[in-house]
Amino acid sequence: YDILLVTLPFHGRRQERTSPFSGHGWFSHGFCHMNETMGHAIHDIRVFMDYLEDLGVPQMGVTGISLGGYTSALLAAVDGRLRCAIPNVPVVSIMDIVLEWFPAGWFARIGMKLGDISVTEARASVAIQSALSFKPAIAKDRLMLIAGAGDRFAPPKHTHILWEHWQRCGRLHWFLGNHLIHLDKGRYLRAMRSFMKHIKFVP
């Protein structure tokens, strides 16, 4: 298979020189900046899709883990050229996740208090980058979700909410483990292949 590995904005070589860790810049400049960053990520991927389409690539799919899963879910909402989408341990409400993380949640709550912003308003401010805000652009039988039963970083409720939003899409696979330790990874990789074979994405 031909695989395109995408480096998201503010990750790896794309991070700022003063960034304390990869991905820091994604969250560190406020809600509007997070929206712009996600829009940038989706734009980058779609530019690559345009290029691959021009080369004559017959079909494309997307998968990603963690923030990559979040991005994969949003891409499935905006680009119907995808043959399949398989978000892995995705989040669906970035605001709720930020509020649960420490110390990010502490800083976010201080900012919200100073700005007199409620949690509802904060959620609405980043709703544009959530897959829950859109109907999927591809058929539900071409969507698959993977989640860790013990994930505390991207809690299972996020995957379940997305599954319901996607009208209980094609497949939902739970694995033993958490966000970092994927026990039985071989099983969900086989499940992914079975799913892709079922929709005729792979022979």
Predicted regions and their residues:
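Cap/lid segment of the alpha/beta-hydrolase catalytic domain
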Residues: 1-40
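Conserved acidic catalytic loop of the alpha/beta-hydrolase fold
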Residues: 32, 42-58
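Gly/Ala-rich beta-loop-alpha elbow adjacent to hydrolase catalytic centers
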Residues: 63-72
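Hydrolase active-site cap/lid region
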Residues: 73-118, 174
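Active-site nucleophile elbow and catalytic-triad environment of alpha/beta-hydrolase enzymes
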Residues: 118-135
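Short beta-strand/loop motif that positions the catalytic acidic residue
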Residues: 138-139, 144-147, 151
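Conserved alpha/beta-hydrolase "acid-adjacent" motif
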Residues: 152-158, 184
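Histidine-bearing beta->alpha loop at or near hydrolase active sites
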Residues: 174-188
